[in-house]
Regions:
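Catalytic phosphate/metal-binding cores of nucleic-acid and nucleotide-processing enzymes, i.e., regions
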Residues: 66-67, 125, 148-153
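A short glycine-enriched loop-to-beta-strand structural element that forms part of the catalytic core
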Residues: 54, 58-62, 92-108
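Intrinsically disordered, glycine/charged-rich C-terminal tails and inter-domain linkers
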Residues: 1-2, 9, 135-207
Length: 207
């Protein structure tokens, strides 16, 4: 799916496979995870009108192209939800950080033996840094929106995007739930399962 050049303010998501370093201890398992991640991302973006992106190693970069800011946010949340739901079916969890700001995609630069996408902009950098070293540390399965630089939005009409605990820097998107009334029970199950590491987290996300 070719991506045309883009330059403007939009929402950008940085997503990666949780626990990929552990998966890399077995080349076959790591390769299977990567292949499924890429295929899932390709299928979701192919069927999504307003979100584009690409995947490199264990990471994906998504951005919304058209519409007002509310539409852009809803579009990227929907894509993230679909990718996460398909990944969790194979017991793979993702972490996803979303930011708003400038984003510049300059197409594909081709060199012999390698392909590189030129991407620049505050939104991409902010999403990447939040995913890698944001505080509190993002946990497996989580998708969160960085509040810094957010435009005016009608958050009340996105009931599964909420503030969480004492974290004043983010809003969390509960992609796996259907009703905000389920959030409190999920959080309890997630905390209780954390000691079981990834197996327990997967069970909580699937419940």
């Amino acid at each position: 799916m070719p991506i045309t050049d883009f330059n403007g303010n939009t929402f950008v998501a940085f997503t990666d496979i949780s626990g990929f370093k552990e998966l890399m201890k077995n080349d076959a398992i790591a390769l299977e995870a990567i292949k499924y991640f890429y295929q899932t991302g390709f299928n979701v973006l192919r069927d999504t009108d307003n979100v584009e992106g690409f995947f490199v190693s264990d990471c994906g970069i998504l951005f919304s192209r058209n519409g007002d800011n509310q539409t852009k946010l809803l579009s990227i949340l929907d894509a993230v939800k679909k990718i996460n739901k398909r990944m969790i079916e194979r017991n793979y969890m993702l972490t996803t950080s979303i930011s708003f700001g400038s984003f510049d995609y300059q197409g594909k630069i081709e060199f012999q033996g390698i392909e590189k996408n030129a991407i620049y902009g505050g939104a991409y950098v902010q999403s990447f840094l939040d995913n890698e070293m944001g505080k509190p540390k993002i946990q497996p399965g989580q998708c969160r929106l960085v509040k810094q630089n957010l435009p005016q939005l009608d958050i009340e009409n996105i009931p599964l995007l909420v503030e969480r605990g004492n974290d004043i820097q983010h809003m969390y998107y509960y992609w796996h739930l259907e009703n905000p009334k389920e959030i409190q029970n999920f959080e309890k199950n997630y905390r209780d399962s954390y000691s079981l590491k990834y197996a327990g987290m997967i069970n909580a996300l699937k419940s």
